[in-house]
Amino acid sequence: MNSAFFEELKARGLVYQVTDEEALQKQLNEESVKLYIGFDPTADSLHIGHLLPILMLRRFQQNGHVPIALVGGGTGMIGDPSFKDAERSLNTLDTVKAWSESIKGQLSRFIDFEDEKNPAILANNYDWLGELSLIDFLRDVGKNFTINYMMSKESVKRRIETGISYTEFAYQLLQAYDFLKLYETEGCLLQLGGSDQWGNITSGIELLRREQEVQGFGLTMPLITKADGTKFGKTEGNAVWLDAEKTSPYEFYQFWINTDDRDVVKFLKYFTFLTLDEIATIEEEFTANPGQRAAQKALAKEVTTLVHGEAAYHQAVKISEALFSGDIQSLTAEEIKQGFKDVPTYEVQPEDQLSLVDLLVTSKIEPSKRQAREDVQNGAIYVNGERRQDLAAELTETDKIEGQFTVIRRGKKKYFLLKY
């Protein structure tokens, strides 16, 4: 095993809290350790808030350990109260099952379930929680924990004033039971999670100690914060998903390329597999010439390639460059769809007049014919990146990209899409 591995995790800032660090380091240095992270299905896709823990599993696997990705098919039906301000809405079994299947597919893009030496393991806690009777749960799990112990957890304390249901109160015991089951079936000794999971993780370690008389370990990663105070993982209020159908590779790339200067080096350490020496070199270049955004470009390249593949990364760069230069005609219809997903779109009807001035008004790009004429004459209207100043101009087949789209720009930055 790589004895420097744990030190590198710390150097990257990936270790927030750890139980018995010395004993854990010894274990990691001496043998291949089985470890797990749980992913509760709360939607049909994982998002970039899950990326740090997923990549932690990958880091451990690359260093000879065996990662277990636990899909919370059972716990996902209840909802973890950890540092949530309100009770979660409950999802149906069919919904959670469908979400669990989607998540399984996504995880296999990051960790190797076929590796010859240390293949990753995929588990679903519905397999045991779905069969667990209330009597068995109270007898085998509940008896090991006092109410005082459970109430002492910070995640529970924060909800006492506003109210917490017994269902969510008992969540930490279900997560503790997961750790016990994974120890019994797989020999798993280490649980990883975000810093909000510390209370749940230590409950699992306590259950292992009481039921099996073994020492389990817990390690948490830091809560990801952004220098500007906004929530990590959201762009304009929307989650950034790992599923290309929900967040296009172009949007994904844009999220990373727009990283704040104050966050970018930290994110290179968190989210890429560049060595610390490589990151230090990028940091030097970035510090010397921040306007070139070398660090943001490296971050966006590494993470987009990791999640969506090299072809999607190159496509995202092509779209970005075309939008910056105005060379819209170099884009395919698929690239137009990605790059202009969020701009106002008008579906051109068969009866619509195809004169430029008329279409500008019909599509509500312009409020009136007078304003449309004025903007055309003044050179403020662009069709697929080309300025059009002819008041009698009509849109022709050559203005339709692959027969599907025409991109209109008004002024410097206002984009609109005509769809055929």
UniProtKB/Swiss-Prot annotation:
Entries under CDD domains matching the protein: S4, TyrRS_core
Keywords: Aminoacyl-tRNA synthetase, ATP-binding, Cytoplasm, Ligase, Nucleotide-binding, Protein biosynthesis, RNA-binding
A Pfam family assignment: SYY_C-terminal
Occurrences of domain S4 RNA-binding (ranges): 354-420
Residues that, per the record, bind L-tyrosine: 36, 171, 175
SMART domains hit by this protein: S4
Molecular function in Gene Ontology: ATP binding; RNA binding; tyrosine-tRNA ligase activity
GO cellular component: cytosol
Main localization (coarse): cytoplasm
InterPro entries assigned to the protein according to its UniProt record, in alphabetical order: aa-tRNA-synth_I_CS, aa-tRNA-synth_Ic, Rossmann-like_a/b/a_fold, S4_RNA-bd, S4_RNA-bd_sf, SYY-like_C, Tyr-tRNA-ligase, Tyr-tRNA-ligase_bac-type
Cell compartment(s), UniProt: Cytoplasm
Catalytic activity: tRNA(Tyr) + L-tyrosine + ATP = L-tyrosyl-tRNA(Tyr) + AMP + diphosphate + H(+)
Chain's role: Catalyzes the attachment of tyrosine to tRNA(Tyr) in a two-step reaction: tyrosine is first activated by ATP to form Tyr-AMP and then transferred to the acceptor end of tRNA(Tyr).
Subunit-structure text: Homodimer.
Protein name: Tyrosine--tRNA ligase 2
Organism, as annotated: Enterococcus faecalis (strain ATCC 700802 / V583)
